[in-house]
Amino acid sequence: MSFNRDDDSKLKFKTSKKLKVSATFESMNLKPDLLRGIYFYGFEYPSSIQSRAISQIISGKDVIAQAQSGTGKTATFTIGLLQAIDSKSKELQALVLSPTRELASQSESVISNLGDYLNVTAHACTGGKALQQDIKKVSKNCQVVSGTPGRVLDMIKRQVLNVRNCKILVLDEADELLGETLGFKQQIYDIFTKLPPTIQVVVVSATMSKDILEITKKFMSDPVKILVKRDEISLDVIKQYYVDVEKEEWKFDTLCDLYDSLTITQCVIFCNTRKKVDWLSRKLTQTNFSVSSMHGDMKQEERDQVMNDFRSGKARVLISTDVWARGIDVQQISLVINYDIPDNLENYIHRIGRSGRFGRKGVAINFITKEERPKLKEIESHYRIKIKPTPANLEELS
């Protein structure tokens, strides 16, 4: 798991107290079998957020960790919780909550891989599949559950998920979980009331608004805050451009021109609605372009198949709504196209963060109509960046 160490080391953090920065995984005093899992997974040295946050999580403190996409936040909380788990006890000891099924499944995969030599058992509990499958899995000595709030709360209420000895709760992509948009906040509160009063809480996200930080006070005790300084959230490793298409109906031809001209490994195209995803996928397929698509209305088996095809490289172009913008890690994505400018400012950084993973160079291209120009200006102002016009010579993008 390589990343651009120079770019990562330039990140500046604002912390609530002076923190020890661990230059190596060995200096964190991790279990030998956990270290084996870390190195086998491909990590060589900790990223900036890992070098600051892992030791704080291991110490048992409540932690709020914020860093840009692709810097290893999932491994940060995973290493912390795996260090805390008692391998001899087969009871549930860690609970990870995520806003999407795909992200919950990805976290479970990272936990299982890093914890392989510890013989830790983990399971992803998400909607969209038979409840009985989850009940069967968690009843068999499951030490870590990674899931979506609705399914996890349902299983706790049914008393099939026993949380009485749970040591650590992780909220991944916390701004989504605690925001008003997706309606998870009450479910998070309800889950929290079922957990032991001594539970350690770790909150992780690429963006962290003042409102979300205020909400965390309700269930966190004097948390250590590790936040990227505001002017560092520009994702410098990603070249950002716009194409002024003037009218909505001209976007499609522009996309076809780009598709023909660019040499890419893998690409994600974001639309704001499920209807637009289906329309664009159908239209591109009719024009003999090979694409796959995914959104929240699809059955879970379909979404899983799309994800597997994209991860394996079988599919090169994926069209999606913002369900895919959060935390999903596919290393070979080199291009993100915002067919629609996101309605939510925070989603811009989550979308373009799909390219440039772990410091790799990536490109983001934004299609804008006359009506969308103010949105682009708002994004530039919010992130203190300048998004350039797409160069006439498209080879400059590669």
UniProtKB/Swiss-Prot annotation:
It comes from the Eukaryota. InterPro entries: DEAD/DEAH_box_helicase_dom (IPR011545), Helicase_ATP-bd (IPR014001), Helicase_C-like (IPR001650), P-loop_NTPase (IPR027417), RNA-helicase_DEAD-box_CS (IPR000629), RNA_helicase_DEAD_Q_motif (IPR014014). One of its GO terms (biological process) is rRNA processing. It is an enzyme of class 3 (hydrolase). A motif (Q motif) lies at residues 23-51. ATP binds at residues 67-74. This is ATP-dependent RNA helicase FAL1. Keywords: ATP-binding, Helicase, Hydrolase, Nucleotide-binding, Nucleus, Ribosome biogenesis, RNA-binding, rRNA processing. It catalyses: ATP + H2O = ADP + phosphate + H(+). A motif (DEAD box) lies at residues 172-175. ATP-dependent RNA helicase involved in 40S ribosomal subunit biogenesis. Required for the processing and cleavage of 35S pre-rRNA at sites A0, A1, and A2, leading to mature 18S rRNA. Its main location: nucleus. The keyword Endoplasmic reticulum does not apply. GO terms for cellular component: nucleolus. GO terms for molecular function: ATP binding; ATP hydrolysis activity; RNA binding; RNA helicase activity. The Q motif is unique to and characteristic of the DEAD box family of RNA helicases and controls ATP binding and hydrolysis. Residues 237-398 form the Helicase C-terminal domain. It is found in: Nucleus, Nucleolus. Its EC number is 3.6.4.13.
